[in-house]
Amino acid sequence: MPKKILFTGGGTVGHVTLNLILIPKFIKDGWEVHYIGDKNGIEHTEIEKSGLDVTFHAIATGKLRRYFSWQNLADVFKVALGLLQSLFIVAKLRPQALFSKGGFVSVPPVVAAKLLGKPVFIHESDRSMGLANKIAYKFATTMYTTFEQEDQLSKVKHLGAVTKVFKDTNQMPESTQLEAVKEYFSRDLKTLLFIGGSAGAHVFNQFISDHPELKQRYNIINITGDPHLNELSSHLYRVDYVTDLYQPLMAMADLVVTRGGSNTLFELLAMAKLHLIVPLGKEASRGDQLENATYFEKRGYAKQLQEPDLTLHNFDQAMADLFEHQADYEATMLATKEIQSPDFFYDLLRADISSAIKEK
């Protein structure tokens, strides 16, 4: 009988990416892989799109809020139903372990696995834990973290960032689409790539639309999340979504303007790519991106600009400063020890699963 592992995590692409890195490795080693998530969530979309041999199990999910809302009452019942569904799934499958990447949907499967005596491994990408992982930590066997946590927690293993970016651009797949884009760009201009993510692209889209003069100063690549904005014209490439083209576009850019999500930040760090961080504020998030951005700026990896300060004047000043000190930023990023390979983490996780099973 093949070994089985359950994955969970969703709500944003960031809560799925690491799972999609690990899953093929388990499949290659003969494991049967199952995924618990929201059928209407990004996790189901990404699993379907991946084409991986994964069985998806849908559960009810409710949002966990730190503030009062009448929706909390309805969501209590959704979470309770999700827990019952998760208990049934875990009891039926009897997996060797569960791995969670976080997000609201992950809490019921984590609790269910713990109640049924299954080892639970969770991962936290941000400088501080979100509410879902604060709850999940209580039920976890081990928590792996990208950042060193300020609180000394007994079940935490500081891992660093796990990323599969190509450090050698020659390894990247060739793209005829990329060649077509280059024909519209000027070799005399720096190329900027704007990455807003699923929650933060709108501000960048509006900034570029409001300031057409940017196209006279730079070649602009704008990942918009909105197919209505798709455009390829002189010095401008706007595209709603990219997959295989993502890393080639990052490599093509002289500088990346990004939000403060940890996955993208550490991909840029792994590539030693010059970048400006415009983090989501507390009005649009729990403040984790502000913490991530400050962490990167203090270590000399990047410069940050707060969203309310994103004016053309401030943007131009930030660009000038980054390009003037480009060599210093790149040297600091190249010297980092905060990046781990997927193989390293997979081997560590496999070893920890084996140890947890033996200790039962």
From Swiss-Prot:
- Catalyzed reaction equations: Mur2Ac(oyl-L-Ala-gamma-D-Glu-L-Lys-D-Ala-D-Ala)-di-trans,octa-cis-undecaprenyl diphosphate + UDP-N-acetyl-alpha-D-glucosamine = beta-D-GlcNAc-(1->4)-Mur2Ac(oyl-L-Ala-gamma-D-Glu-L-Lys-D-Ala-D-Ala)-di-trans,octa-cis-undecaprenyl diphosphate + UDP + H(+)
The family annotation for this protein states: Belongs to the glycosyltransferase 28 family. MurG subfamily.
Where in the cell? Cell membrane
Sorted alphabetically, the keyword list is: Cell cycle, Cell division, Cell membrane, Cell shape, Cell wall biogenesis/degradation, Glycosyltransferase, Membrane, Peptidoglycan synthesis, Transferase
To which species is this protein native? Streptococcus pyogenes serotype M4 (strain MGAS10750)
Positions bound to UDP-N-acetyl-alpha-D-glucosamine? S198, Q289
**InterPro entries found in the cross-reference section:** GlcNAc_MurG (IPR006009), Glyco_trans_28_C (IPR007235), GlycoTrans_28_N (IPR004276)
| Full protein name | UDP-N-acetylglucosamine--N-acetylmuramyl-(pentapeptide) pyrophosphoryl-undecaprenol N-acetylglucosamine transferase
- Could you tell me the membrane topology recorded for this protein? Peripheral membrane protein
Keyword Cell membrane in record: yes
A single GO cellular-component term on record? plasma membrane
